[in-house]
Amino acid sequence: MEKLTVKEMSQVVGGKYYGNGVSCNKKGCSVDWGKAIGIIGNNAAANLTTGGKAGWKG
């Protein structure tokens, strides 16, 4: 893997990362299960400790 500079990153044309382990591009979507499982675990713990109101407005 190669680390890109800010200038190099600004020239990258690609897909979208949704922040939950899912990323999509023109060819389709993929899941980084390591990230997804960690996020699911964190969300489950937060919802258990807040009675299901973690991060929700209203």
UniProtKB/Swiss-Prot annotation:
Highest taxon listed in the record's lineage: Bacteria
Keywords carried by this UniProt record: Antibiotic, Antimicrobial, Bacteriocin, Disulfide bond, Secreted
Propeptide: 1-15
Positions of disulphide bridges: 24-29
Annotated compartments: Secreted
First and last residue of the signal peptide: none
Pfam short name (any one): Bacteriocin_II
Keyword Lyase: no
Coarse class of the protein's main subcellular location: secreted
An annotated GO BP: killing of cells of another organism
Keyword rRNA-binding (UniProt): no
A GO cellular component annotation in the UniProt record: extracellular region
Summary of the function given for this chain in its UniProt record: Bacteriocin.
Entry's family note: Belongs to the bacteriocin class IIA/YGNGV family.
Name of this protein: Enterocin-HF
Organism annotation: Enterococcus faecium (Streptococcus faecium)
Gene giving rise to this polypeptide: entHF
